[in-house]
Amino acid sequence: MNFQQSAIPPFSFLLSFTQGFLLGQLSVVLLIGAFIKFFIFGEAPPPPSRGLSHRASTHRRSNSIYTISTNEAGSRSLREKPSTSNVLRPVPSSSTNTRSILRKTYYGAIPTNPSKHGRHRVHHSSHQPESLDWFNVLIAQTIAQYRQTAYLLKDEPTSSILSSLTAALNNPEKKPSFIDKITVTDISLGEEFPIFSNCRIIAVDDPNSDGGRLQALMDVDLSDDNLSIGIETSLLLNYPKPGSAILPVALSISVVRFSGTLCISLVPASTPPLHTPSPSPAPQTADGARTQSQPENNSSNPNQQSADASGAPPKTSPKSNVAFSFLPDYRLDLSVRSLIGSRSRLQDVPKVAQLVEARVHAWFEERVVEPRVQVVGLPDLWPRMGRTGVRTGEDSETGSNAASRSAISADLGSSLRDDLDQGPDGLRFRGPLGARPQFDSVSRSSSFNVETGGFHGHPMTREDSRGAISDDFHMPGSLPDGAVGN
């Protein structure tokens, strides 16, 4: 009995080992088969598309209440005739606030949260900062064009940068009486370009706009440049009589390095203008009163009424603006060299350098350092024929332009042939004698007009009822001038 009990465990041990071995082999076979089926013979996933369809499938936009109401309004507009005062559909504030803009542009910005003291904190976006390499190239091209234009206009008496700086430095309303006329002796616009980097979008609280406003912050750095200006003047001692003593002074100011954080934001047209405190209020003059009353008088100006009738926007219409400024933690390093006196000259006086640097910093902070901002109006980007230009050169003739021009010439040619077949009231072709068709004398006199001494410059002319030749080009079937004017 004891022998049987001792013989059972080896049999059960062998049976469990066999089952485990078979189970392990089966699992290995299944893994190998799954690997061969799904990883070797499986179809590769399609490459990610960069088109708009993939972007639309990745970022699902939920249908808002405004979309539903817009569709309903569109269906109602087919049945009901809208009034003339309700043609432009209103834009809800929910589609123009900060959160809606960030959601529709897929920019992950963190909204502002109230702090313990009741103020709103400014949170940076979770979006990665941008390098702005493309922006640096555009800014560099713009600055290079300004430098080249300033050099080309150096000899102009009114448009040169020298005359502008001289007039600004010698402004009688700002220049003290103890300083003589300031003469600009040297101007250097530099050779390097500012480098912008680390651009990020933040949401700040603004009581004038719904949901706050967006602000772009970017770091700017300008170093190792020779941006400088040199001036000469004289200090006048007007006691006991004017011009009792004269002390010549020569200064040279150079920008060694500038770095800071630039803030750019958009000011909508409906927002009231930003109030920028000035250190000294401007005096009320008769010219200023006349300037303030000028817009009222312009309302009765016939030129302005004709401009409004032609479709151009009025000059008094509100415009969107761009506000930019620098944070107070900027860095502006200057190099000031001075030369005082005529005989025994004092060179590079430290006190003069401190005074000049303090004045330059004060001038800069009074204009573009927070909380003061510079507001610049955005230009009118509506396409107009008055601003239309054509690139010169043979390489600018692209295939699309050539195709469009050939299509236009083909249409004109077909219309000319139709008009010539209709009768003598169509367009006349002026060409050399060898190009004349064999017409009779009547048709020849009405269709061809050859001038002695050379042919007319315009390829097409029109002969009126009196037999005179006019250079005006009129398309067949067009309205007369009187009908167009009415």
Curated annotation (Swiss-Prot):
It comes from the Eukaryota. GO terms for biological process: mitochondrial genome maintenance; mitochondrion-endoplasmic reticulum membrane tethering; phospholipid transport; protein insertion into mitochondrial outer membrane. InterPro entries: Mmm1 (IPR027537), MMM1_dom (IPR019411), SMP_LBD (IPR031468). PROSITE patterns: SMP (PS51847). CDD domains: SMP_Mmm1 (cd21671). Residues 128-379 form the SMP-LTD domain. GO terms for cellular component: endoplasmic reticulum membrane; ERMES complex. It is found in: Endoplasmic reticulum membrane. Keywords: Endoplasmic reticulum, Lipid transport, Lipid-binding, Membrane, Transmembrane, Transmembrane helix, Transport. Component of the ERMES/MDM complex, which serves as a molecular tether to connect the endoplasmic reticulum (ER) and mitochondria. Components of this complex are involved in the control of mitochondrial shape and protein biogenesis, and function in nonvesicular lipid trafficking between the ER and mitochondria. The mdm12-mmm1 subcomplex functions in the major beta-barrel assembly pathway that is responsible for biogenesis of all outer membrane beta-barrel proteins, and acts in a late step after the SAM complex. The SMP-LTD domain is a barrel-like domain that can bind various types of glycerophospholipids in its interior and mediate their transfer between two adjacent bilayers. This is Maintenance of mitochondrial morphology protein 1. The gene is mmm1.
